[in-house]
Amino acid sequence: IQFLEQQSMAKKYQLASHQQPQHISIPLQPVLFIAHLKRLFPVFNQGSISNHFPYYASTIWTDENEQQHQVMVFQYHYVNEVRVRDKNGNDVKVKEIHKDLWGVFIFDIAIQGLAVTTGNKTFDHSYRFPWHTSDIQTNQKLNIFGSDEMQTAKLLTLAFVLKLADFFEQRQGDLMFHPTRSTLCFLGPLHLFK
């Protein structure tokens, strides 16, 4: 049944399962390609044992300005190990916790150097400048960080902040625009393949 659901989804949204986006001029080995994408954003190290993409698919999306973007939708699976000390002081593995998040990479995006999260966290040095909007409700729901203070100030107009608030109205997760590459990554708990 799961296979049929995946096939139906692939046809409906023209998803190319386990395929790299077409914008990559020289296709990489899948392992190298995924490793490259995971290095671009500081959210793919959540597992102490494992961090991998068991499923991904590529397609093309058209935005509200009729511009087409290469897109890769993915499942991110990570595994954490819980360890405790026994009565003799030995480190003992108690259990493994498996978790899944789903996300999307969108390529050829004009915006760079911005990270927005619904979580109570910060990002690595790439997004080191916290930003607060003039809207108290948005500041309570979203944590915003930029890689360059001036660019962040220019980018976060009232209209853009309202778009972010609308985007996160029904979503939880992290939205990151890479500081130097024209790539966006969104990662959250909503299963995107259903």
What are these regions (language model features)?
Residues 4-194:
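Charged, low-complexity intrinsically disordered regions
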